[in-house]
Amino acid sequence: MAQFPLFQKFQKAIQHPPALSLGLPIFLTVIFLLSQRYVWIEDDLELRSTALTNFELNRISFYPLVHATWFHLLLNLVALQPIVSQFERVNGTVRTGIVLNILAVVTAIPWCLLSIGFFPDEAVLGSSAWIFSFMGYWAIRESSKQPTTQLAPNLVVPTWLLPIIYLVVIAIVIPSSSFIGHLLGLIAGWMMALGYLDVLIEPSSKVVLWIENKISRVIDLIPSSIVTFYREEGALDTRAAARADTNRSLSVSGGNFLGFQANSSQADLEAGTRSRGNSSVDPTTSFPGTGQTLGTQ
């Protein structure tokens, strides 16, 4: 029986989804259900202006885990899962978890500083900042190949600015949403794509491998037919090749966004060139990665 190409792609995508991208929606849903029963969960995790001055690390790190309503949760899950999944296939499962935490903190700190002076009584929660961070990240990545995008016959905009449109639309459609929080999340994603967060999101592979070793028993408990765990060893080549492709394209275009230069080095380019020669994966297309299916060695 003939199948439509779109259906085939969808069918392939759901056969072995990345481990974190599958587990995160489940985990967020469980947290939401618990928070409806135990209201202290939301009270303890929502981000407030005092989180920084009181050194409340639980709020600074975990505010994306709690949501106000079912609609809030479902809207974020639908938008978050595919973009995190694509990132995980390139960068590995454990490293993606590290990136999620770093993005939450990088967004929270400036929000707290601004809120002290401008909106001290506000509190924010939810994973929408993650969504805008990854939208910003992928917009920069895409702009290295397609600098501009035509939205209408007489309207052409820089590709890296496309998330701004979503930012404005969300602010209009959902006025109760945190425009500043979304904007700071978007800026964090731009910074990550340009390499300015590498010192935070690029821990040594030895650290990631150590974490993978510690959770290996948990990984093996999940049937291999359900998800794919993208191990650090397999992600090294795809990550280096993807970084090199972006840096090379940004170098050709000048790599300048709002006056900021892409933070790349010749070593990145050379490493990516070597990796691409050893990898059968084309990171500029499907970002499939070199995953380790759960339950296997």
UniProtKB/Swiss-Prot annotation:
Gene3D superfamilies: Rhomboid-like (1.20.1540.10). Residues 268-297 are annotated as: Disordered. It is found in: Golgi apparatus membrane; Golgi apparatus, cis-Golgi network membrane. It is a multi-pass membrane protein. It comes from the Eukaryota. Residues 275-297 have a biased composition (Polar residues). GO terms for molecular function: serine-type endopeptidase activity. This is Rhomboid-type serine protease 2. The lineage of its organism: Eukaryota, Fungi, Dikarya, Ascomycota, Saccharomycotina.
